[in-house]
Amino acid sequence: MADQKNILSVVKDIKDIKIQWATDIAKAAFNVLSTELKKQNFKTFTEAYEFTISSMKSLENARPTEPMLFNGMSYIYSKIEPEIWKSNLKSFLKTVINASETYYKMITDTAKKAIENWIWIINYWDIIFTYCHSNSAVKTILANKRNWIDFMVFNWETRPLYQWHKTAKDFLDAWIKITMVTDNAAPFIIDDNDPMWLHINCVIIWCDAIKNDGSIINKIWSFWICSTAYHSKIPVYIAWNLLKTDIHNDINIETRDFLEVRPDKPEDLEIINFAFDQIPAKYITWIITEFWIIKPSDLKETVRKKYPRMIKSKPRLERS
């Protein structure tokens, strides 16, 4: 088989969280796939086909919670199937490269549209509580700042990797007022019972995956913060690109190494260390997408209308 060194390098970077954020992971995967298909010197259709399928599976399995990546791979698989019958090397490569580049552009364009729609959500002097370190989070809030809206941001540490430490610096560099809160204190502040007498105007979450029923999967503690906001009658907004929808219920809750919790764990002690949790749709006020603002209950119908190919695609486990 042709050399997969560069493919596997991207896979490793995703697993090691050197490449992070759903959008950047998907873009890295489709970029390396199209680049390698152009570079490799395939002799036969079979060689190119086996390289492509193997590479796609490796990239797809790099992270268990990346529906934007999964949906893109489904899109490419749908383009590959007619090519199998042709068994034409040149036609096959052209089809896969075009599909990869088309989806890459789709990611970029839809992300930009979603960020533009967020400008209508944040008001002057709002105090925003946000969680989940993401590229979209940074770009969305910076877009509101460039719109000359003055507001204040509170955020969590995001243990155990402390991703928000970097994000906080990005905001400070952009002259955005930001305060970091320890993870375990965040619900206390949101509930208006804290000694600082803060009133949070809204909670903004950037999530990893969204289910057909409108519930979302996001980094652990998200359930707690959204539950607190819901019972405190504070609106919860989800920043979302519909390309991240878990159409076929492929996404499971990921767990982390127990050593993060207790390196000296006694032999018979069981430890649960979830990396993600699931937020019920009833806790969510609005989902802001590339196609404007929708209710969680309207999610599946919106995806059906805007991305019918996603609805018709095969689940991952049913692919050849």
Give the role of each language-model region:
Residues M1-K94:
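Long amphipathic alpha-helical segments
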Residues I7-D16, S54, T95-E101, I149-V153, ...:
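Glycine/charged-rich beta-loop-alpha catalytic/anionic-binding loops adjacent to active sites
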Residues D16-I19, T35-F42, K57-P64, S78-K86, ...:
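Generic secondary-structure signature for well-ordered alpha-helical cores
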Residues T23, I127-V138, P160:
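Gly/Ser/Thr-rich loops at beta-strand to alpha-helix junctions
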Residues Y77-Y124, L142, F151-H199, V203:
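Ligand-binding beta-strand-loop-alpha-helix segment within the catalytic cores
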Residues S134-R146, C226:
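Histidine-anchored nucleotide/phosphate-binding helix
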Residues W156-S320:
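Conserved phosphate- and dinucleotide-binding cores of soluble alpha/beta proteins
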